[in-house]
Amino acid sequence: MKILLLSKKNFRIFAILLWSLFAILCAGHLEAVENSAKEKKETRNGGEDLAAKTQNPVGAMYSLPFKFTFDYGADNGEATFLNIQPVIPVTIGDWNLINRVIMPLIHTPGLVTGTPEIPNPVPGNGATGLGDINYSVFLSPAEPGKIIWGIGPSVIMDTATDDQLGSGKWSAGPTAVVLIQPKPWTMGLLGRQLWSFAGDSDRANVNQLLLEPFINYNLEKGWYLITDMILTANWQADSSNRWTIPLGGGVGKMFEIGSQKMNTKLEAYYNIVNPDGAPDWSMSWTLQFLFPR
């Protein structure tokens, strides 16, 4: 087992992350207590309404997902990711600001291509630690119509604790999402384009497109079917190694532990197109704490 030794800078980063997660949990718990009567009604309806809210990327609901991903079939071995993805909504007048953060904890056995978290990996003997943190904020109508949308900026911060775990660059660009929710469906597309603007001059520039089409079909008693494919294009790579395109899906379930609303899902995807040496399969399990407003 490898032991990660943190510098003072990285220790401060971890401390800030831990305090942020604690604050999110406390705020969400207070929201859940204040809305307990409403949630009891949703529970009697089998959780379908709450499932639809959870499947809306710009829904005004506090949540704290933990997504564990296992990439299998890369030339250098299997990479694992634990993405901590808090969602913090803020309502300002007729608008919602949906703050979404992705904090990746990564183990990589060496250079692994074709992953969204590390667009331009460098050779090495493997590393374990914090990757580059992604922060996105979406401006979305507080009272959406039939077509739900959100748009805003996205930033990748150079926070990786090892060169093998990040791009070595600060990157930014636009992000947007559009979806519809005709019961029992949720269907939409999230997109993001990033360009690097600062960082290690010896590392390759970042020019990455991410497209995430998603479809959910809600069943009874909180069960649902899902496909949530993350397509990426590394515009810095040659055309034969540019795209990663997965195909697959999974199943999810809304449930409770005491009064705590929860969501879990299990997914598997096969990369029908991927760069040389990239993983063939990606399997993920998500556990999400929900704090409806």
What is each of the regions a protein language model found here?
Residues 33-293:
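Transmembrane beta-barrel domains of Gram-negative outer membranes and organellar outer membranes
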Residues 1-46:
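Cleavable N-terminal export/targeting peptides
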